[in-house]
Regions:
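DNA major-groove recognition helix of helix-turn-helix/homeodomain DNA-binding modules
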Residues: 25, 43-61
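Residues within the helices of the helix-turn-helix
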Residues: 7, 18, 48
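The DNA-contacting recognition helix of HTH DNA-binding domains
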Residues: 17, 28-29, 58
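The alpha-helix within a helix-turn-helix
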Residues: 10, 21, 51
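A short, Lys/Arg-rich alpha-helix, primarily the initiator
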Residues: 1-12
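Conserved hydrophobic/aromatic packing and binding residues within compact polymer-binding modules
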Residues: 6, 20-21, 31-34
């Protein structure tokens, strides 16, 4: 997980850890722990909320939570190559 990019997106949106903690229904301490951990500690449902709260594109979501592994895997599957530009907003 790219913790620096996650924090940068939060700051860019003028949100505090407290704001995201409230949106996720967790304590501020838990949010701090999740945001500072190199290992992805977010549940799938929490990631969906963060996509909305941080207004993340697919590329940003992939970069933050999966270190671009989703994109790498999709590029290997030829049938997905035609939809990749749509996912990235290109």
């Amino acid at each position: 997980m790219n913790v620096r990019l996650l924090k940068a997106k939060r700051v860019e949106r003028n949100l505090r850890q407290k704001d995201l903690a409230k949106a996720l229904g967790i304590t501020e301490k838990a949010m701090c722990h999740k945001e500072c951990s190199e290992e992805n500690k977010f549940k799938a449902a929490e990631m969906l909320i963060l996509i909305d709260e941080l207004n993340l594109s697919f590329a940003e979501f992939d970069a933050i939570f999966f270190n671009r592994e989703l994109t790498k895997r999709l590029r290997k599957i030829k049938k997905y190559n035609s939809i990749l530009p749509a996912l990235f907003g290109n």
